[in-house]
């Protein structure tokens, strides 16, 4: 929820910056910021206990509609620390299990069935 709060803070900062420079902002943009604050309050406040999985999915879809529709609400940043190349462990020798013909003890003595 901290990321949602950061997006809300950035939106209100941009709103007041625009308001101080131009003196006016369209009501539709202000309504979108109010909806953003309502969603943040609903997810972080006392109403979060009543939000179901379907409600959460609808809120996420609404946030994607809000993000980028106005210059006030920025798209969220997704950071991926994953790489395209993954190391594999091919240097490991596969263990001979008890299904195998050759079995050994903990002292590396072979067990032979008579």
Curated annotation (Swiss-Prot):
Main location group: virion
Keywords: Viral tail protein, Virion
Annotated compartments: Virion
Signal peptide: none
Transmembrane segments: none
GO cellular component: virus tail
Domain of life assignment: Viruses
Assembly information from the UniProt record: Heterotrimer with THA. The heterotrimers further assemble as 12 docking hubs that anchor the trimeric tail fibers.
Functional summary from the UniProt entry: Forms the tail hub together with tail hub protein A (THA).
Protein name (Swiss-Prot/TrEMBL): Tail hub protein B
Organismal lineage: Viruses, Duplodnaviria, Heunggongvirae, Uroviricota, Caudoviricetes
């Amino acid at each position: 929820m901290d990321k949602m709060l950061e997006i809300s803070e950035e939106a209100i900062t941009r709103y007041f910056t625009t308001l101080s420079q131009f003196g006016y902002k369209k009501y539709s943009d202000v309504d979108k910021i109010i909806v953003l604050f309502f969603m943040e309050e609903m997810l972080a406040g006392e109403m979060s206990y009543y939000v179901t999985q379907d409600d959460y999915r609808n809120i996420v879809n609404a946030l994607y509609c809000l993000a980028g529709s106005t210059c006030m609400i920025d798209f969220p940043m997704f950071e991926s620390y994953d790489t395209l190349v993954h190391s594999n462990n091919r240097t490991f020798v596969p263990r001979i299990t008890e299904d195998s013909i050759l079995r050994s003890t903990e002292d590396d003595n072979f067990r032979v069935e008579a």
